């Protein structure tokens, strides 16, 4: 199949070039080329013009009138050559290299030998007049360089052998079409046409530095590289095919892969952030009571939440207590009524009636099952029981007898008579949920009907009715149902008092004594339940008991049929491992935990069968213990110790949830209750379905951290509220959804719980509270327990208010560290922004909450330099509000103090505004720019004087702040101060001292431009001059990206790009872009790895817009633009230079060499060659970047013989190997204030070395005047020694 795919890929490449196999071909063609950077490049060119009086090739005159007045050359008025037409027909390979015919010459460039052309417009805007009968060159050469035989250019590192030799360069301007693959066209094909023609001028070009090792690599035959291509083809093809397969995963339906509340969150996160007003309009069309409501059941209509969900979910956070709670006699249905998986269908009629009730401003209270024997026997009288049975029987008889199955497979819980009755009523065609009874429906029932007595008392008086009620559920099991057995046993084991009553009534139990002992249902299987399967979040719900510690299984689920060890335990979705262990009776029916490791009882009715259970979970009937699996006497069982199992796949529960296991015998039925209070508490605290079924906010596989609820009064209050719900029947209250918001804000835990039980939507938003949710209110007040309750009940943890505030923002702004920790651990996003662009870090920094800021930064997901809509960073907010310790913290975390806001103020401006001299000193010690001016021309001294901040004024004056600097209004700091104030006096004195010493002229650094990039860079680049009166250079156009003035035919076809399909940060070895670069060369901070070869830098292929990774992946650095603080300044002897305003670590991206993309032939006719950078193409046409007329700050970077920058070829938006982007990375630690420099290359100095010398000042300078003189002396001495070989011997023989 792989061979067939490869053959099909090759065929598709030959025919259509648009098949997905183009990715495979591109990998096969590009990878060897990326590794072949050291191969020999054929370069050609002509002798260039010299620099205009500046040194190191980066300095020119302030203006160039000839260029400024020249007409611009546009693409529209360019006439294509015949070769260009051929090139359009030729095929372009996926790697960007043209696969044109070998006879095709250079395209899109003016040939120098065409004397029939009388007038041509060059790409630089000049008219190129060429008389047909004259042999003049296209440009009049400068007198200084007319006789220079070299062609200088800045070059890339790793190819010293690629520079053109002076002896091979032609002396005529005539050229012939270049034949690719046949060597240098200029050196072989150019032939003189007349002996009297002028000598062509070769242009100076900056190049990549060449190493000695590069000479050997460059000298290798190209065929050797091609030999290595073959074994890589199959590997690359497989990699590409795998990448394509990863692009087409089979995703399940959204409602099947996530609970509906998760789907709600997943969609509303992005929608809320992008279209807040559209969402608000859409939501407002609903009734106010229905705003934001959603169900926990996928693909269901909106409905109120059910009572059983809230009780069930809080079983994971309540903990058992020892003492009086054990005295309560609670029936086992306390767990099963709320733990079963009842699917309440919301019919249209039901939804309409509920909406009508909501429009009147009230929610229906949840009707607690009256027949539920959770009510303690001590507090419930027989009269109350009779009344309850009458009411429930009335409801049963009123429902029509249809007997149809409605999702019967999902309703097969046999835990209690109450659940059977409810499902029986539902299957009878009852449209209303029996859990929530609208008041008007209850009012319709004006007369009572005979009751079938389906309750705990019905077990004693009417066994026939029990069997009838059980028939509806028995169909859900695949084996013979034990419904009637369970019901009889329930009647036997309901309570201690009932046991005594049952002993006196043998007529009920005497029919079948064997059914008195409950048997397990380990081998019974219940059909799938859509609700439980969805809320299980595709994870196993098993809880393991390992040495008295409980752990959660995190394995994925394959089969969704439900299982449980007994009717006391909830229905579970299990993984294959736990399904097999369930069938082997390794799950204790008493507590529902898997007996994994520790001390257990083991019953062996047969040699090949063993039943595991806890000693205290044995079934007890009439003071006799029995095996809860088979009913055999427990005395026959033996205690075994199972070795500790591998628990690496489990999640250990909170310490508070484990203490219930220390006394696992609390299920002892001799106390009169099959689910006594301790057993109920233990089940609630460790029930596996609670955290599984209520995980609405986190991604798949995220377990809600129940340990986030701290031990304290909130925990005790919650426990008491849950116990009250389980032991008593609360009054039928009618709550308005608005009450949930106020109760959450006031910390009324019990009321919040009751309202959630009643089904009030936890995402209800208050219209008059900026559409804030109860979670906003709880987070704002710091009620962690209520936050946990709301999140577990389905509250959207990232819900946004009208001003786009999230609950995490409210907690951070109000300094509730515990709430912040809980929300982040529960999955809240830390980087959303509110309507003003502020994150939670901005809000906390503004208020000075040190601990919150420290925790947010330690989380690792927060950007310490994030800016809001005003451009203000957390550092600026902390500075303005005088939070000194917070400023120190942010500075230690890497905060950039020179980031400018929208008005180009830096932190020092805001320190002057606030008047905090301590922060100002900290900022100045961190090398903050004291002379920075904002958009109004104000320096920090201006602002301090205007705000009358005397201490700051004195501090700035002591640091030599310019008191004479004028802003755009023409005001000096002295004029900004209040007349005769203390600040005015200090400024006046400073000015007088300066004026009193006119004989000591001090060079004052003046800011001649606040940003030479005019805002095109993310970080402004100021220009200063402290040497002379030269203004900021204006004889060029600043551009932040490469530009063209003539067609270059760069292959930007997105289908030709090789791309990755990474889901991580692209740091793994499987990233396709990293493989093209041999590996990802960036670390997590965006710096080059230490093993990066600075001498011969490899090609770097960054991730592009065709990749599936995120925009902030690790393999995107250069495309993020300028990040370092740079400054253009006037040097003493090298014209303009560039220096850093901050410390730049090793391997940091500094800037990119940006200019005009031109061809090699076009570079030969350019008059100014000081800004040419050779792109070092290996095959075919050679291209250059000319920063003379268009460029960025890198055009001012001077040469240095010990460079602190190295140029690297990088590919981003395209992968055309002819046009790499040149990125400068630091080769060592660059100190703040240090001048930047890179090695121009030998080719540049071969031409320019005769015009000027290098003045880098390095001890290893190779191109200084002294080094040049030494080389000339050595060169002159060698011929002399060769001409007189016997001079030394003759002198020795001379007696004189």
UniProtKB/Swiss-Prot annotation:
At which residues is Phosphoserine found?
Answer: 433, 481, 1046
Any idea where this protein resides?
Nucleus; Chromosome
Per the record, which residues fall in region Histone H3K9me binding?
903-905
Q: Where is this region: Interaction with histone H3?
A: 1160-1179, 1240-1243
Write out the entry's keywords from A to Z: Acetylation, ANK repeat, Chromatin regulator, Chromosome, Isopeptide bond, Metal-binding, Methyltransferase, Nucleus, Phosphoprotein, Repeat, S-adenosyl-L-methionine, Transferase, Ubl conjugation, Zinc
Glycyl lysine isopeptide (Lys-Gly) (interchain with G-Cter in SUMO2) crosslink site(s): 23, 191, 229, 232, 315, 325, 430, 559, 644, 659, 729
**What is this protein's tissue specificity according to the annotation?**
Ubiquitous.
Q: What class of enzyme is it?
A: transferase
Cite the binding residues for Zn(2+) 1. 1060, 1062, 1066, 1071
Ranges for domain SET come to 1124-1241
In this chain the ANK repeats are located at 735-764, 770-799, 803-832, 836-866, 870-899, 903-932, 936-965, 969-1002
UniProt: Zn(2+) 4 binding residues: 1201, 1254, 1256, 1261
- Please state what is observed when this gene is inactivated: Embryos die around E9.5. Levels of H3K9me1 and H3K9me2 are drastically reduced.
**At which positions is S-adenosyl-L-methionine bound?**
1134-1136, 1171, 1198-1199, 1255
Q: Which residues carry this modification: N-acetylalanine?
A: 2
Q: Which residues form the Pre-SET domain?
A: 1058-1121
Crosslink Glycyl lysine isopeptide (Lys-Gly) (interchain with G-Cter in SUMO1) sits at which residues?
23
Spell out the activity regulation: Methyltransferase activity is inhibited by BIX-01294. Efficiently inhibited by compound E72, a BIX-01294 derivative in which the diazepane ring and the benzyl are replaced with a 3-dimethylaminopropyl and a 5-aminopentyl group at sites B and C, respectively.
| Compositionally skewed regions (Basic residues) per UniProt | 438-450
The record lists Zn(2+) 3 as bound by 1066, 1103, 1109, 1113
Record note on quaternary structure:
Interacts with WIZ. Part of the E2F6.com-1 complex in G0 phase composed of E2F6, MGA, MAX, TFDP1, CBX3, BAT8, EHMT1, RING1, RNF2, MBLR, L3MBTL2 and YAF2. Interacts with MPHOSPH8. Interacts with CDYL. Interacts with REST only in the presence of CDYL. Part of a complex containing at least CDYL, REST, WIZ, SETB1, EHMT1 and EHMT2. Heterodimer; heterodimerizes with EHMT2. Interacts (via ANK repeats) with RELA (when monomethylated at 'Lys-310'). Interacts with Baz2b.
Q: What does the UniProt record say this protein does? A: Histone methyltransferase that specifically mono- and dimethylates 'Lys-9' of histone H3 (H3K9me1 and H3K9me2, respectively) in euchromatin. H3K9me represents a specific tag for epigenetic transcriptional repression by recruiting HP1 proteins to methylated histones. Also weakly methylates 'Lys-27' of histone H3 (H3K27me). Also required for DNA methylation, the histone methyltransferase activity is not required for DNA methylation, suggesting that these 2 activities function independently. Probably targeted to histone H3 by different DNA-binding proteins like E2F6, MGA, MAX and/or DP1.
- Provide the protein name: Histone-lysine N-methyltransferase EHMT1
State the species of origin.
Mus musculus
């Amino acid at each position: 199949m792989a061979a067939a795919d490869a053959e099909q890929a090759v065929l598709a490449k030959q025919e259509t070039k648009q098949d997905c196999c183009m990715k495979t071909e591109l990998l096969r063609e590009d990878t060897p080329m990326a590794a072949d950077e050291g191969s020999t490049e054929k370069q050609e060119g002509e002798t260039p013009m010299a620099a205009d009086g500046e040194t190191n090739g980066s300095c020119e005159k302030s203006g160039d009138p000839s260029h400024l007045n020249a007409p611009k050359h546009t693409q529209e008025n360019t006439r294509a050559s015949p070769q260009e037409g051929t090139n359009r027909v030729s095929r372009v390979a996926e790697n960007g290299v043209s696969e044109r015919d070998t006879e095709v010459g250079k395209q899109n460039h003016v040939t120098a030998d065409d004397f029939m052309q009388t007038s041509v417009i060059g790409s630089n805007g000049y008219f190129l007049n060429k008389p047909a009968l004259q042999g003049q060159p296209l440009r009049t050469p400068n007198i200084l360089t007319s006789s220079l035989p070299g062609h200088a250019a800045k070059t890339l590192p790793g190819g010293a052998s690629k520079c053109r030799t002076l002896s091979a360069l032609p002396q005529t301007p005539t050229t012939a079409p270049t034949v690719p693959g046949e060597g240098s066209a200029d050196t072989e094909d150019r032939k003189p046409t007349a002996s009297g023609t002028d000598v062509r001028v070769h242009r100076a070009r900056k190049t990549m530095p060449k190493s000695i090792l590069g000479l050997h690599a460059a000298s290798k035959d190209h065929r050797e590289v091609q030999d290595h291509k073959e074994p890589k083809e199959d590997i690359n093809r497989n990699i590409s095919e795998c990448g394509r397969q990863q692009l087409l995963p089979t995703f399940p339906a959204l409602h099947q892969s996530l609970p509906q509340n998760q789907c709600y969150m997943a969609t509303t996160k992005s929608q809320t952030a992008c279209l807040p007003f559209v969402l608000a309009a859409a939501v407002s069309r609903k009734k106010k009571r229905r705003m934001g409501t959603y169900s926990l059941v996928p693909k269901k209509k909106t409905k109120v939440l059910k009572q059983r969900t809230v009780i069930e979910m809080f079983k994971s956070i309540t903990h058992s207590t020892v003492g009086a709670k054990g005295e309560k006699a609670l029936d086992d249905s306390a767990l099963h009524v709320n733990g079963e998986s009842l699917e309440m269908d919301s019919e249209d009629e039901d939804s309409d009636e509920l909406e009508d009730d909501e429009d009147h401003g009230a929610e229906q209270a949840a009707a607690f099952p009256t027949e539920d024997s959770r009510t303690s026997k001590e507090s419930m009288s027989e009269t109350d029981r009779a009344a309850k049975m009458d009411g429930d029987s009335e409801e049963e008889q009123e429902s029509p007898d249809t007997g149809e199955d409605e999702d019967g497979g999902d309703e097969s819980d046999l835990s209690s008579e109450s659940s059977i009755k409810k499902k029986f009523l539902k299957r009878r065609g009852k449209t209303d949920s029996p859990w929530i009874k609208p008041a008007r429906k209850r009012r319709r029932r004006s007369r009572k009907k005979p009751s079938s007595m389906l309750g705990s008392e019905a077990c004693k008086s009417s066994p026939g009715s029990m069997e009838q009620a059980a028939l509806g559920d028995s169909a859900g099991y695949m084996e013979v149902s034990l419904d009637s057995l369970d019901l009889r046993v329930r009647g036997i084991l309901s309570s201690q008092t009932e046991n005594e009553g049952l002993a006196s009534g043998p007529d009920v139990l005497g029919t079948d004594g064997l059914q008195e002992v409950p048997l397990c249902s380990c081998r019974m299987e219940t059909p799938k339940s859509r609700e439980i399967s969805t809320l299980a979040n595709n994870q196993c719900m098993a809880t393991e008991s390992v040495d008295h510690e409980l752990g959660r299984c995190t394995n994925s689920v394959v089969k969704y049929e439900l299982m449980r060890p007994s009717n006391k335990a909830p229905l579970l979705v299990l993984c294959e491992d736990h399904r097999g262990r369930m069938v082997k009776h390794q799950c204790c029916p008493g507590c529902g935990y898997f007996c994994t490791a520790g001390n257990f009882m083991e019953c062996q009715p047969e040699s090949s069968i063993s039943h595991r259970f806890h000693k205290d979970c044995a079934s007890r009937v009439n003071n006799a213990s029995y095996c809860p699996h088979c009913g055999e006497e427990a005395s026959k069982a033996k205690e075994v110790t199972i070795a500790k199992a591998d628990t690496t796949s489990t999640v250990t529960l909170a310490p508070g949830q484990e203490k219930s296991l220390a006394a696992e015998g609390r299920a002892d039925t001799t106390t009169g209750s099959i689910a006594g209070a301790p057993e109920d508490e233990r089940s609630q605290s460790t029930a596996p379905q609670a955290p599984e079924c209520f995980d609405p906010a986190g991604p798949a596989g995220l377990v809600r951290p129940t340990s986030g609820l701290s031990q304290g009064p909130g925990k005790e209050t919650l426990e008491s509220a849950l116990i009250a719900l389980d032991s008593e029947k609360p009054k039928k209250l009618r709550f308005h959804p608005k009450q949930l918001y106020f109760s959450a804000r006031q910390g009324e835990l019990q009321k919040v719980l009751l309202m959630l039980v009643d089904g009030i939507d936890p995402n209800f938003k208050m219209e008059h509270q900026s559409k804030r949710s109860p979670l906003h209110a709880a987070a704002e007040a710091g009620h962690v327990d209520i936050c946990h309750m709301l999140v577990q009940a389905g509250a959207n943890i990232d819900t946004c208010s009208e001003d786009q505030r999230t609950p995490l923002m409210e907690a951070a702004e109000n300094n509730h560290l515990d709430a912040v920790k809980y929300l982040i651990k529960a999955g809240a996003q830390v980087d959303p922004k509110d309507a003003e662009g502020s994150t939670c870090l901005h809000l906390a920094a503004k208020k000075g909450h040190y601990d919150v800021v420290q925790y947010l930064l330690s989380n690792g997901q927060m950007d310490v330099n994030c800016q809001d809509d005003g451009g203000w960073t957390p550092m600026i907010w902390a500075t303005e509000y005088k939070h000194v310790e917070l400023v120190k913290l942010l500075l230690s975390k890497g905060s950039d103090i020179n980031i400018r806001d929208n008005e180009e103020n830096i932190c020092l401006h805001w320190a002057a505004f606030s008047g905090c001299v301590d922060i100002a000193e900290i900022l100045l010690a961190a090398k903050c720019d004291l002379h920075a001016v904002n958009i109004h021309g104000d320096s920090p001294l201006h602002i301090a004087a205007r705000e009358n901040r005397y201490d700051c004024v004195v501090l700035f004056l002591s640091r030599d702040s310019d008191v004479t600097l004028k802003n755009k209004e023409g005001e000096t700091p002295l004029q900004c101060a209040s007349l005769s104030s203390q600040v005015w006096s200090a400024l006046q004195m400073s000015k007088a001292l300066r004026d009193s010493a006119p004989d000591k002229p001090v060079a004052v650094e003046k800011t001649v431009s606040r940003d030479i990039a005019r805002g095109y860079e993310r970080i402004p680049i100021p220009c200063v001059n402290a040497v002379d009166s030269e203004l900021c250079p204006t004889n060029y156009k600043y551009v932040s990206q490469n530009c063209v003035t003539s067609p270059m035919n760069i292959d930007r076809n997105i289908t030709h790009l090789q791309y990755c399909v990474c889901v991580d940060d692209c740091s793994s070895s499987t990233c396709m872009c990293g493989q093209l670069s041999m590996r990802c060369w960036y670390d997590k901070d965006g710096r080059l790895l230490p093993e990066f070869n600075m001498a011969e830098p490899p090609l770097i292929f960054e991730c592009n817009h065709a990749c599936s990774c995120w925009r902030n992946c690790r393999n995107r650095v250069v495309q993020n633009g300028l990040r370092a603080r740079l400054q253009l300044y006037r040097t003493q002897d090298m014209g303009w230079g560039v220096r850093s305003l901050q410390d730049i670590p090793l391997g940091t991206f500094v800037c990119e060499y940006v200019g005009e993309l031109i061809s090699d032939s076009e570079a030969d006719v350019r008059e100014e060659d000081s800004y040419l950078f050779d792109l070092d193409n290996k095959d075919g046409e050679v291209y250059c970047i000319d920063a003379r007329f268009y460029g960025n700050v890198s055009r001012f970077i001077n040469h240095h013989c010990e460079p602190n920058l190295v140029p690297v070829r990088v590919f981003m938006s395209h992968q055309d190997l002819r046009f790499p982007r040149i990125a400068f990375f630091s080769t060592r630690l660059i100190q703040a204030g240090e001048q930047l420099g890179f090695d121009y290359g030998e080719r540049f100095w071969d031409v320019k070395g005769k015009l000027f010398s290098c003045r880098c000042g390095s001890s290893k300078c190779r191109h200084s005047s002294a080094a040049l003189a030494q080389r000339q002396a050595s060169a002159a001495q060698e011929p002399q020694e060769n001409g007189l070989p016997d001079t030394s011997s003759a002198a020795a023989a001379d007696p004189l």
